Amino acid sequence: MTDARPPREVRAYRAWGAARHLAGGVRDPAFRDLVQRIDGGPLHRCPPVVLLVDGAEAFRVMMQAIDVAREEVLLETYILRDDTLGTSVQQALVRAAARGLRVCVLADAVGSIGTDDDFWRGLTDYGVTVRLFHRVWQHPLEMLRRDHRKLLVCDRALAFTGGMNVGTEYGSSILHYEGAWRDTFVQVEGSVARELAAVFAEGWDRARGPALPGLEYVSWAELDTTPSLQLRVRPPAFPLPFALPHAVQRQLGRRRDRRRGRLVRRVIETATPDDRAVLVLDPRPGRGQREMLGVIAALLGGARERLWITTPYFAPPTRALSLLTAAARRGVDVRLLLPSARTDVPIVRHAAHGAYATLLAAGVRVFEYERATLHAKTMVVDGYASLIGSSNLDFRSFWLNAECNVLVLDGACGAAVDDTFQQDLTTSREITAAAWRARTMPHRLLDAVARGMRWAL
């Protein structure tokens, strides 16, 4: 029994405990070593990260990047619609293929189920290689496992990732299009973009089978004529708390966690902070999920002043909820920005409602965004550590979906996410404990039922 791995939640708790005892929290130089050890991937030094919070501007920048690309364009998305924006992206990809570039599109078969075959032929007939991830009729046993990533990589040097799918509702500014959604993307360069290309390559080879009948299956090895990408190698077991870097292990304090009877190591000596750092987190079923949970737990444990989270689908496991409320109880300014009645999935909103009483009692401030449909997925800790990507705080993102996120350790990016969060609060409504207690009995009943089935949503 002693050789068995502990439950995922316990491993995440270890990461939380290790971060709790860093003197500087997420700003502590040892925090960088901590999250890198949790994930096992490289920590990148890179040019400034650009935050894109307006859909129209984000897609203008991305299509411009496609138009100036010289060798390769890789697009991976959960939803690719055959609407106005989707057609514009299609045309940009066709133009790139006409210039002789290698252009590859990977879309989820369920997310893009409403897209007509003629749209895909409008890509494949002009030299774009397309694959659909896990068609239900081809892979019925894997129906729940979806490719929820959203990323664009150009020449393995410039990349974009975040929460935006390809559809008119994502790509229109809320100032110009009443039905637009509020979402967030980031632009990264250098070695981060190269790793995101490796993420795409891994997803491409997992999407078995061609996009359309009659097309041949083409593996990534057959497509890739440039030097092969070095895919990420993760450690075989969760490394904490016994594998912290030697540089920060010289003076360690130990205390006994009486509740769990486990040793939590405390880092006393730290080094000089480095420059901006970015960590790519790309969990998928069978790999990277516990690392993703560990990094989130470390962010919650490392918060010292404020912890601001934006998520459209909030249905976390009990352990994650307890770590969130623990931060509020120790005096951290914890705020949650969640969707209002304009949500696209009302049942998940009611599942989130089932946790409101616990959150409010712990001192977490809860807001509902009312200006548009909320779809952004961001977390910013102490104005320094920012987590941006496709992952929601729900069971699907934790256990079923392939996701793509970037953890940015940088004050400038943190300040930008902070500013965006505060701007979003100006068009949001705060939920008070008194108002919450006054909700109707049918509302309470629906919240309880949805909360009970949150693992299936």
Regions inferred by a protein language model and the residue ranges of each:
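Catalytic-core elements of nucleic-acid end-processing and repair enzymes
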Residues: K377
